[in-house]
Amino acid sequence: MVLCKPLTAPCATEIGVTERGDDILIVRKTDALWGLPKLMQETRVDKGDPADPVNFDLRRQQTATIMPIAVAFPVAIVLWFGTYYMLPPLAGMEDVVARLVFALKCSCVAILFCFVTGIEAVAHERLRSPAIDPLSGYDTPRMRVNLRYLQNTLEQLAPFVAGVFGLAVYCSDGRSIRAVPATTVVWIAARIAFWIGYHRSSAQRGIGAPGMVVSILVLLYVCTRFGFEIAGTVGAIVPLVLFVGAEGLLFWATKPLHHR
């Protein structure tokens, strides 16, 4: 492997070629005989290592992550209410079973366009690269992003699906059930935005944050309604208080450790 100094410019040697990204230096070895790139020998060197508190600018990364989030939330709110009010009331939704079936259909749409597409993206890249052998150790930045997207989407599917099913239970008619497709549209859009943003930079994945937030809000609504059924107003307040307390505890417990 050949590293070129300074890191601000690309360079070439008899055995290697470097390319400079915004935050990454990529070094590729070339075949000494044929001069062809060896895909198995691509090396990525982080210039700002998060494990190194001296060189990693946390505040800059936080600012870069928060900005897309701030832009995404107003768009998500408009999208949710726009979907809700533009859809006509749905017929035959007075029966809870019909509403649950409708929630299942919405979940299927979300899984198809957000999860299955991620699986296909990884599968296509494996088919057309040395990664067709999963044990070869070959990967690319694109594949790593797609794999992280898949893992994150799988994690977020659980609260989303549970939320839309619970929401369907408490939507009493064809008018209020429109909240289910509105939530689904926002979640799908947020997942796609997260995926595209992640490929641009790790900070821009924050544009998908409204997807998780809408799932949390729906679950809180379902839990407060459930609590009200059990113990009235007090029962409705308890889940909110406990969740806010848990968030505060997690915020405190996950603060970074100071290195000497």
Residue ranges of predicted features:
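Core segments of transmembrane alpha-helices
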Residues: 151-166, 217
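Long, highly hydrophobic alpha-helical transmembrane signal-anchor segments
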Residues: 56-112
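Membrane-helix interface/capping segments
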Residues: 116-140
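Hydrophobic core of alpha-helical transmembrane segments in multi-pass integral membrane proteins
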Residues: 69-85, 111-122, 220, 239-254
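Short membrane-interface loop/juxtamembrane segments of multi-pass integral membrane proteins
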Residues: 134-156
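Hydrophobic alpha-helical transmembrane segments in multi-pass integral membrane proteins
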Residues: 217-232
